[in-house]
Amino acid sequence: MATVTAAKTDLDVAGLPEVADPSQVAPKDARQLTRLFFDQLSRLEEGTAEYSYARNTLIEMNMSLVRFAAGRFRSRGPEEMEDIVQVGMIGLIKAIDRFELTREVEFTSFAIPYIVGEIKRFFR
């Protein structure tokens, strides 16, 4: 399980926890942290270090969603799997940029269609 601590840097001002390795966060913890990071992301000004940290951490924490969605296209061949994951990451980034916490929808439910849609667009 990844280590989550209170940030001792400038990020502490934003109230964001420091996540040592976002890609190693357990899915149950990722759900709670994702909600916290989206809450802070909506309050932060785009272009600041805190905003970039929150956005990048969200991307890294939710990379497993991309691998999960890309698994549906495994039959396309192992050589294409890396390309599929890269295209899926674009979908994840679009989902993060468009997600609104006020809609009270789980982020995973919101992101999977974006990820799969981007992958399908890759094959057209």
Residue ranges and their predicted role:
Residues 2-124:
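Alpha-helical promoter-recognition and RNA polymerase-docking modules of transcription initiation factors
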